[in-house]
Regions:
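Short, flexible, mixed-charge acidic loops at enzyme active sites
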Residues: 166-172, 516-521
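Active-site-adjacent "gating/activation" loops or surface patches in catalytic cores
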Residues: 152, 158-167, 415-455
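Glycine-rich S-adenosyl-L-methionine
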Residues: 176-195
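Glycine-centered, small-residue-biased loops immediately flanking beta-strands
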Residues: 204
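Conserved helicase NTPase motor core
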Residues: 124-156, 160-162, 166
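Short glycine/proline-rich turn/loop motifs
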Residues: 117-126, 169-177, 433-447
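Accessory, often C-terminal, charged low-complexity segments
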Residues: 1-123, 127-128, 144-148, 152, ...
């Protein structure tokens, strides 16, 4: 090393000398044992649409493999750029329209999201999922600005690096002939996993699926990036028929669950019943008498499934908290149809002093929470919560008491038979052929548009292991592919009424053979014909739209059903918005010229509730009626802004536009302590400048 330092000191080019000294410093700090791999040249990414300036790094649009990079040294009035290759001094002039900006990882970037459209089938209070078309490393940098320490589960299915040219490094496919392919893959993954770690909550879990090609390398990398976490490897049988290979027929792939070593049971066990049932919150008090009463014994026709279900009276009992005056909102009728022995619906709660109406209404008999002694008790759940359980079939009639002419209303719960999940999953629902490839073909109306999609149920069960008891979980997938994670999240929400939301990230990569054909036809990156052939435009977005609407892109209803009987054509009552990752100039942001471009970020970071509309006249501040954030544009309007926030306890995030640190501190002190407050545009610019320094 000392000899190298002497040689570097003799280099006359001071800039080159500094770069060589920096590289040597990295070598000296590098570990010599454990997982050792080359960092390689900095990764690069093409930024379609970013304006070209003097000093920009660019490539030619017709250079499919990005073999040559150039530096822009001059711009002319006739829309020409004078460029110089990085490896020579031979300048040439090309039209600006023939060039694309390239960024190296470590160069400062200032990303934003541009909406490409939305689907809203859920109500306005339901948060939106987000599906982002963009380079996942930059998108992860953006998410660390918005969601550091807030993500419940990250599920990723990265490229498996099989040697079959199934992924790119520096815009070039990596194949079996590349002797550095494993090292490149590790370098590629390490950068992204380090950002992913910043996103996770203290009890957040990372799930990574992989096969034998990088299994052991990945395990060591996860140990390095997540040293304070336990790593569990689960084998999932995805191809019961097996692949034709020498010696063994492989039927499985692996999933690493990277779980915080907190001592708590973070991964939730399951049974076959619980996999399709809603979460049940007991809503019981410690002092409630939990001994079953005679009328809680299931009716004869319910005894057959008593091994799987426990039946509990729908009426609270035992403690003082079970009486009507303690919970007046939980005193209401449950209407039943006696002939078919069916619980139909709930009625409205009545005032404490009102007497319950006992007569039939529309042929339905009302059952009130009144015990055998005539005491007014209350039901276990509020009307909305009880109605949700009725619709799921979990509120049933029990025994009929002929003497008192009364019915028992029971709620059924899955018996507590939950066991720890095993490390081998063999379930026909996880077959990637039937529930991945074939399902995707149904939804897109054409086969072969995406290779090897996951079974939706393998993804659902993986997510459920982490978020089953987190109905408002935030889920991220930054190798989104065909959008299976979004579909699985919708299915979990439909099963239990949850409001989990997912953020999916994928690029718009075009398959190699098709990209070459398009280039031969004169269609390049950024051209509509080229982009239409990409994974986001052709697969991810159409699949997510089909999931929500139940319709293919051609308007035809999707045939078939989910396991459990839910028709595909019914879709889901979810909201989802599609975005493109774009890039801003720091000076424009600093001057306050880019608020409209940043508005979707603020909306997404505040929970993605409602819509992100910018009115023509804000009056100095913005507190959207249907969203959960507020923005102050002018300090002089702070008092009415503060008054508006007082009327909106649902607002969670506040952004203050000011150049004064002191004014920001004073306004923060005057705001409620439960608000997340940030300073525009300082915090945004600082974050991405800091990320660039950490990457360099």
């Amino acid at each position: 090393m000392a000899n190298l330092e002497d040689l570097i000191a003799r280099v006359s080019d001071r800039r080159l000398q500094a770069e060589m000294a920096s590289a040597l410093g990295i070598l000296k700090r590098r570990q010599r044992f454990g997982l050792v791999f080359e960092e390689h040249l900095p990764e690069t990414t093409v930024l379609v649409g970013l304006p070209i300036q003097v000093g920009s790094l660019v490539q030619r649009r017709d250079d499919l493999g990005a073999r040559t990079l150039y530096r822009v040294i001059d711009l002319t009035a006739d829309q020409q750029a004078c460029i110089v290759p990085l490896d020579s001094d031979a300048a040439e002039s090309l039209p600006l329209a023939s060039l694309l900006v390239v960024k190296r990882f470590g160069d400062p970037i200032f990303p934003t999201l541009t909406s490409l459209g939305a689907l809203r089938r859920g109500d306005t209070s339901r948060p939106s999922h987000a599906v982002i078309n963009g380079e996942n490393y930059h998108a992860l940098q953006l998410l660390t600005f918005l969601f550091a320490g807030q993500v419940d589960c990250i599920y990723i299915d990265p490229p498996y690096n099989t040697g079959a040219r199934d992924w790119k490094y520096n815009n070039r496919y990596v194949d079996d002939n590349d002797t550095w392919r494993h090292s490149k893959w590790l370098s590629f993954m390490a950068k992204r996993l380090q950002l992913a770690r910043r996103l996770l909550r203290p009890d957040g879990v990372l799930i990574v699926t992989i096969d034998e090609h990088e299994l052991h390398h990945l395990g060591m990398l996860l140990e390095k990036v997540f040293p304070a976490h336990a790593r569990y490897m689960v084998s999932i049988v995805i191809n019961p028929k097996g692949r034709r290979e020498p010696n063994f027929s492989r039927i499985d792939e692996q999933a690493f669950f990277v779980v915080p070593s907190t001592g708590a049971e973070i991964v939730q066990g399951t049974t076959s019943l619980q996999a399709i049932l809603p979460l049940i919150d007991s809503e019981t008090d410690d002092e409630e008498d939990e001994r079953p009463e005679e009328d809680e014994v299931p009716a004869a026709e319910q005894a057959d499934d008593a091994i799987d279900w426990e039946y509990r009276h729908a009426r609270r009992r035992g403690a003082e908290s079970s009486y009507r005056h303690q919970r007046p909102n939980q005193f209401y009728p449950i209407f039943i149809d006696e002939a078919p022995r069916r619980v139909v619906r709930v009625g409205a709660s009545i005032a404490v002093n009102d007497e319950p109406h006992l007569g039939h209404i529309d042929g339905l008999r009302p059952i009130w929470p009144i015990d055998a002694e005539g005491r007014h008790r209350c039901w276990r759940y509020t009307p909305d919560s009880m109605q949700a359980r009725i619709e799921l079939g979990n509120v049933v009639l029990g025994k009929y008491n002929r003497t008192q002419d009364s019915w028992t209303v029971n709620i059924r719960y899955p018996r507590n038979k939950s066991r720890k999940l095993k490390t081998v999953w063999w379930d026909t629902a996880h077959d990637a052929g039937t529930h991945g490839t074939q399902l995707l073909s149904k939804m897109l109306g054409a086969p072969g548009l995406f290779p090897f999609p996951k079974s939706i149920y393998a993804v659902r069960d993986s997510l459920a292991a982490v978020v089953r008891n987190r109905p408002r979980a935030l889920i991220v997938d930054f190798f989104a592919g065909s959008g299976t994670t979004f579909h699985a999240t919708c299915l979990l929400n439909a099963d239990d009424g949850g409001q989990r939301r997912s953020i999916l990230i994928t690029n718009n990569e075009v398959a190699e053979a098709e990209a070459r054909l398009l280039y031969e036809q004169g269609h390049y990156r950024g051209d509509p014909a080229f982009e239409a052939a990409g994974i986001f435009d052709r697969v991810t977005r159409p699949r997510c739209e089909a999931v929500v609407t139940g319709l293919r892109a051609d308007g035809a209803p999707i045939a078939g059903k989910h396991i459990g009987g839910r028709p595909l054509h019914t879709g889901f009552t979810e909201n989802v918005e599609f975005f493109r990752l774009d890039y801003l100039e720091a000076d424009s942001v600093d001057l306050g010229l880019e608020f409209a471009a940043l508005l979707p970020l603020l909306w997404l970071g505040a929970g993605a509730v409602g819509e992100h509309r910018l009115p023509s006249d804000t009056g100095g501040f913005l507190v959207p009626d249907d969203s959960t954030f507020g923005v102050l544009f002018r300090e002089s309007r702070f008092r009415p802004f503060r008054a508006a926030l007082d009327q909106r306890p649902d607002v969670t995030h506040v952004w203050l536009v000011t150049d004064s640190e002191q004014a920001f501190a004073e306004m923060c002190a005057a705001l409620p302590a439960d608000k997340r407050v940030a300073m525009l545009y300082r915090d945004y610019l600082r974050h991405f400048r800091a990320r660039a320094r950490q990457t360099a």
